Design a protein with these regions (language model features):
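Conserved class I S-adenosyl-L-methionine
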Residues: 1-44, 55-59, 79-82, 86-90, ...
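A short acidic, Gly/Pro-enriched loop at the edge of an enzyme's catalytic core
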Residues: 103-114
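A short SAM/SAH-binding and catalytic strip from SAM-dependent methyltransferases
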Residues: 113-127, 150
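Conserved catalytic/acceptor-binding region of the Class I
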Residues: 128-129, 135-213
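Conserved hydrophobic residues forming the short capping helix/wall of the S-adenosyl-L-methionine
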Residues: 64, 87, 165, 193, ...
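Conserved Class I S-adenosyl-L-methionine
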Residues: 3-8, 15, 27, 53-55, ...
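Class I SAM-dependent methyltransferase SAM/SAH-binding core
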Residues: 45-105, 129
Length: 273
């Protein structure tokens, strides 16, 4: 998880809801796409930055296999606790989980074939510094794969949450939900990677659907996995009730055949050290 939201993800209820609702329906499909983009191969060494509950790391460990190596870092200990509690997937490499920031990375130089960061870089206070650290720890011609969401308006589940929040709670709290979408420019992301020294950089923009099969109530439960949820829990009960009533109204707009269906769109860059 990203540095700027560490304190929210250190509230245990948030990582638990994140892992239950968001990981399987959102982050695992995107992790598969990211691993495809970097063409991860058997036997390679991988660094996963802002691993959260280990989503990318676990799938990467299967791809590199027992002869590969995976180091996964995060700054939120409750997220790492969830990741460490999971059994390895069949045929995977061991995963070394470490509590660490992205600047500096806990690795010697030229140690990895691939560095990955799924939906973390936009939160880091020193984005260029984090990119330079990724390049430092990569072997010559090593590969980087980074995914960053586009505008919140093109990610309608969180747009629905934001609309409900803006209508019912203080603006400062409401706008925390926009943090994952704070670096929507693909060209800016690509330029930052070039400034950090990466080359042969390719930019992809992809969309994938997220389906909450149990509908609106499940989508409301999913909100508990966002870093805004602890702040909402501190509001007066009547304010919370008003918020969730408005949230149900907004989420109803996304219902198809009883399910909440929302596309998510992200920029992805792949480059070489």
């Amino acid at each position: 998880m990203p540095d700027a939201t560490q304190f929210q993800f250190n509230v245990p209820s948030v990582p638990q809801a994140y892992d239950e609702f968001l990981r399987p329906r959102l982050f695992e499909p995107w992790a598969t796409l990211l691993l495809d983009a970097v063409a991860l191969r058997a036997g390679e060494s991988v660094l996963d930055i802002a691993t959260g509950p280990g989503t990318v790391a676990r799938l990467a460990a299967v791809r590199v296999g027992p002869q590969g190596r995976v180091l996964a870092i995060d700054i939120a200990q409750p997220m790492l606790d969830i990741a460490k509690a999971k059994a390895l997937l069949p045929g995977s490499a061991d995963i070394d989980y470490q509590l660490s920031s992205a600047t500096p990375l806990p690795s010697p130089s030229a140690a990895f074939d691939v560095a990955l960061c799924q939906q973390g870089l936009q939160f880091f206070p020193d984005r260029i510094g984090a990119l330079r650290e990724m390049r430092r720890v990569l072997k010559p011609d090593g590969r980087v794969g980074i995914a960053v969401w586009v505008e919140i308006e093109r990610n309608p589940l969180y747009a629905a949450y934001h609309a409900a929040l803006r209508a019912t709670v203080p603006t400062q709290l409401a706008d925390l939900i926009t943090a994952p979408f704070s670096w929507p420019s693909g060209s800016s992301l690509k330029s930052a990677a070039a400034e950090a020294g990466f080359r042969a950089i390719h930019l992809l923009t992809r969309s994938l659907p997220m389906v909450l099969e149990a509908g609106v109530e499940q989508a409301v439960q999913t909100f508990a996995g966002t870093p805004v949820a602890p702040g909402v829990a501190e509001l007066p009960r009547e304010v919370q009730n008003t918020l969730f009533a408005r949230m149900r109204q907004e989420l109803t707009k996304l219902v198809k055949d009883g399910r909440v269906v929302a596309d998510w769109t992200s920029n992805i860059i792949v480059g070489q050290a």
